[in-house]
Amino acid sequence: FIPSLKKADCPSLYAGSNASKPYSSADCIVYRLGETYLISAEIDWRLGNNQSAAERLTTLRNRACKGHDHSMDITAAEVTQEFLLDGYAREMIGEWNRWMTLKRFRAFESRITKANPQITKFDKNIHYLRPIPTAELLLIDNANEYQNPGY
C-alpha cells in the first residue's frame, strides 16, 4: 500500500466536458489561514513568547477539531522547534513551501535523515542553497563568481 495525496485535485473543474484533460480550472492555493497561524506562532517562539505561540497553535488546532475538550490545548512548554516543524508538516503537507520552512529552521539534515535514513549525500554546506539556473548564468560574463558552492 502506497498512500497518495491529491490535496488540490478537483476533477469537476477540468476544462471542457472531457474529465480526462490533464489540467484544471481550480484555484491555486497560494496562502492559507493555517499557515498564517503557524508563521505567527513561529515568530512568537523565536522572540521567546512561548505562551503567545501556544495560543496561536491552539487556535489552529481548534480549527481542525471543533468541539474538542481542552486536553488538546497546547502549553507554552510544548512549543519547541520540533513541535513547530511537526505542525508545519501536518498543516502544510503536500504544499510547495516545505523546502523554505526547512531551510529557515536549518532543519534539512535532521528532518530528511529522520524520515529517510538512507540519504547519505546531504551536505549542509551545499544543499541549503539551490543552483542558479544555467540559463541565467549564461547572461553574465563572470558567471563563475555567482554560482552557489557545490554546483
Description of each model-found segment:
Residues 2-3, 10, 20-30, 61, ...:
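Long, intrinsically disordered, low-complexity segments
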Residues 65-66:
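Helix-capping and short linker residues that terminate individual alpha-solenoid repeat units
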Residues 1-60:
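C-terminal substrate/ligand-recognition segments
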